[in-house]
UniProtKB/Swiss-Prot annotation:
Its main location: membrane. One of its GO terms (biological process) is cell differentiation. It comes from Mus musculus (Mouse). It is found in: Membrane. This is Spermatogenesis-associated protein 25. The keyword Chloroplast does not apply. It is a single-pass membrane protein. The chain crosses the membrane at residues 153-173. The gene is Spata25.
Amino acid sequence: MSYFVSPQSHLGLLPSGQGGAASSGSSLGLYSPAEPVVVAPGGLGPLSQKAEQVAPAAQAWGPTLAVPEARGCSGGVSWETPRRKEHNRYCPKLPPMRPLESLGWADPCSRSRAPYLGGPSRPRPLLLCGLSPGVLPISSEAGGKEAASQPDICILTLAMMIAGIPTVPVPGLREEDLIRAAQAFMMAHPEPEGAVEGVQWEQAHAHAHMASGQMPLVRSRRGSCL
């Protein structure tokens, strides 16, 4: 069996500067748990042979294991990370690490640095879930193209409605937009004088039939889809 002995009972094993939890009058006591001393049953001294057997077993794992090293912190023992050169010796295929600034990324850990001052020619680095710079370009011409293509959609929708083709509701397209697009199209493409007179005759004929209670006869114009 092994015992925890006080420094007063075995003065030859421990220096006098290390204090224990046992009293000065007792021969056996509880030593400080931070510094245990293993004593052989015969009282011949500490078992240094077992400690020597444990040390090669720990070294057999190589330098990849973290080695506890006493630091200046008050918390106790801290763990030392493996060195880069030793890691590269066991893993030569891994490329060397480069700083984030060389890749065009801002370091999120450095809050004391100056803000990024980028011009229009240099895109601002993105910090969104691993997206690289330039993945989400914001173009100022997108709004202009969308506004320019909306009258074309209105005219196409009107033409399909006149031709009797079933249309699909366009999101964001209102009835006022259709009316404005039809008016702009009629102003940009005026009809010839004969066609205007025919339209006026049809309207007058329709009003006359409606006044007499008869159904008007619709005459199709040349070149129309009806």
